[in-house]
Amino acid sequence: IDREKADIQYPIFVKEELVLNYKGEEIDGVAFDVDLQKELKKDIKLQSLPLFISEVDGKKQYIIPLRGKGLWGPIWGFISLEDDLNKVFGAVFDHKSETPGLGAEINQPFFEDPFSGKSIFEGEELKSIKVIKGGAGEDNMYGVDGISGGTITSDGVTDMLLERLTMYLPYFNKIKPTIEVNSVFSSMDSV
C-alpha cells in the first residue's frame, strides 16, 4: 500500500484494532491512539501495545507498530506478520533525523522490501530479524542487508524489532500456543 494512500486504504484492509497489555490480554483503548513514544517511557508492565489486524485476499496479517532509536533520533515503522505469526508480510520504516544517504535510507524500498518473506521464529524460539552489515545472503531467513554507512541506524532497526516483537509474544502464544513465551514475561507476574 502506497504511503500517500494509507488513510484511504486503512478502513478497507484493517478489520480489527486491539490494545494489549504485557500479558497479551486485550484492554480498553483505541490502537490508533496509542503513542509509542510515551508508552516506551513506561515500565513494561504498564505499557499499552497497539495491534492492527488486516485482511488481504481472505488472509489475516498482524501489524505491529515499532519505535526505536537511530543514530540521531527516533526511528519507527510497522511490521506485518502473516497469519502463521512467523512469516513477514511486509515492513515499513521511517525516521526524523537520520543521515541523508546513509541511515535515512531505512524508508526506501530497497531496504524495506527484503523483509517480506523472512521469518521471525526458528521453531518456537523468537529470532526476530537482524539487519546485517555486509549482507545477509538470500538463504538467511532471519536477516536482511544493512545500509552501507548506516550501521548505528541498522542496529537500531534490529534492536527495535526484537524489543517490540518480544512484547507481543504473550499475545502470540494465546492465539498460537506453540510459541515460546520469553521467560521475562512469565517471571513478571511474581514481581
PLM region spans:
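Flexible, solvent-exposed loop/hinge segments and secondary-structure transition points
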Residues: I1-V191
